């Protein structure tokens, strides 16, 4: 049997576990965080044009899909390299008008690309779920700089404040890496303090592991023991479990979607 070569369109294939679909709108990454191999493996960012995305979303909605999740390594940097430079807020506005589509989500965002325009789009568009995934990765500025994240703790705190002012009922998820090379107990405590202060709905935590080809592996010494990383990971999981329980307790007796 002949095997058909992949087309430019099929490279952006969508999985369709109806009634939901996960839909890649941008591939690659331009950020080059020191611990991440993605930019080297997947190349620079490449966005799909809005008309193409709308057409395919309309097609899957006709087949019964009610909810789409827009995907990208840094989904909120969508469109900057396209000729007319649309952004994610423009795309959300376009998809919000599709008849039969009930919900729109997107992930994962980068703090430096989370614009006020995008925040206001989430607040105002009725089909866009009030949920934002926004990885902080660490609560110490020196660690963030070593990670090459491109923002400070103070910037991130103000960003979360702006989001919560604009979207009072927003659910925010974040990611944290523990045991990054050189992370001291004091620096880890700053991450705990930040999580306690910002009280995220969900925290995804991972222990740092060297990735061949990344600048962190080339330039930094992985000096935190595996048991030490495991203890820090468990500490965050226990903290977040308490926070999530307290948040959920406030919802008792309410009807929520």
Put a short name on every predicted segment.
Residues 62-185:
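Conserved SAM/AdoMet-binding glycine-rich loop
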Residues 144-147, 215-219:
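Short acidic, glycine/proline-rich loop/turn micro-motifs
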Residues 252-257:
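Structural detector for short beta-strands of small beta-barrel domains
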């Amino acid at each position: 049997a002949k095997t058909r070569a992949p087309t430019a369109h099929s490279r952006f294939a969508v999985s369709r576990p109806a009634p939901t679909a996960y839909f890649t709108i941008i591939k690659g990454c331009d950020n080059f965080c020191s611990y991440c191999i993605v930019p080297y493996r997947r190349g620079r960012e490449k966005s799909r044009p809005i008309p193409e995305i709308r057409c395919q979303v309309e097609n899957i909605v006709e087949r019964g899909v009610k909810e789409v999740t827009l995907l990208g390594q840094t989904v909120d940097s969508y469109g900057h390299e396209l000729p007319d430079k649309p952004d994610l807020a423009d795309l959300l506005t376009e998809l919000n008008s599709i008849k039969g589509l009930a919900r729109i989500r997107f992930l994962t965002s980068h703090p430096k690309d989370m614009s006020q325009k995008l925040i206001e789009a989430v607040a105002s568009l009725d089909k866009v779920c009030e949920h934002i995934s926004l990885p902080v990765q660490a609560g110490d500025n020196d660690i963030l700089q070593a990670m090459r994240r491109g923002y400070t703790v103070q910037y991130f705190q103000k960003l979360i404040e702006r989001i919560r002012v604009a979207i009072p009922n927003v659910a925010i998820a974040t990611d944290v890496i523990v045991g990054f090379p050189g992370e001291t107990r004091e620096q880890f405590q700053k991450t705990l303090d930040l999580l306690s202060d910002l009280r995220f709905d969900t925290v995804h935590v991972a222990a740092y592991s060297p990735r061949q080809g990344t600048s962190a592996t080339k330039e930094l010494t992985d000096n935190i023991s595996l048991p030490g990383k495991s203890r820090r990971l468990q500490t965050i999981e226990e903290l977040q479990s308490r926070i999530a329980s307290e948040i959920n307790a406030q919802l008792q007796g309410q009807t929520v979607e």
